[in-house]
């Protein structure tokens, strides 16, 4: 019984500390992570549907981006996604990318 209480207390404390860390990120960092996760999910969907990397690049070239750095970053994310042997669903890729991006941003602080 005591072990169960300690495990529950530890879980609650870890959850609260992670939430507190996530709140330290600025709006821009969250936007960049969200945007990147959308690009990664789209690339994974294209890959799983059979679209070639060349075709995915052409779609990105035709797309309008609000910031100059976004086009090349999207190309890099797409290429890394295509080079990965992963067959995960796009929603799983999106979640994983976002979590790792947030973790990376927090580690840089």
Regions picked out by a protein language model, each given a short descriptive name:
Residues 15-19:
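N-terminal signal peptide c-region/cleavage motif recognized by signal peptidases
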Residues 1-8:
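Bacterial N-terminal signal peptides that target proteins for export
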Residues 1, 20, 107-109:
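Short intrinsically disordered terminal tails
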Residues 20-59:
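N-terminal secretory signal peptides
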Residues 51-109:
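Compact alpha-helical subdomains of small soluble proteins
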């Amino acid at each position: 019984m005591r072990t169960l209480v300690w495990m529950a207390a530890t879980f609650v404390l870890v959850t609260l500390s992670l939430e507190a860390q996530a709140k330290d990120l600025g709006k821009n960092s969250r936007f960049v992570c969200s945007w990147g996760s959308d690009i990664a999910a789209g690339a994974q969907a294209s890959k799983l549907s059979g679209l070639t990397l060349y075709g995915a690049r052409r779609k990105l070239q035709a797309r309008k981006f609000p910031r100059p750095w976004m086009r090349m970053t999207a190309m890099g994310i797409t290429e890394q996604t295509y080079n990965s042997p992963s067959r995960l669903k796009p929603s799983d890729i999106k979640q994983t990318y976002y979590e790792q991006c947030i973790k990376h941003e927090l580690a840089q602080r």
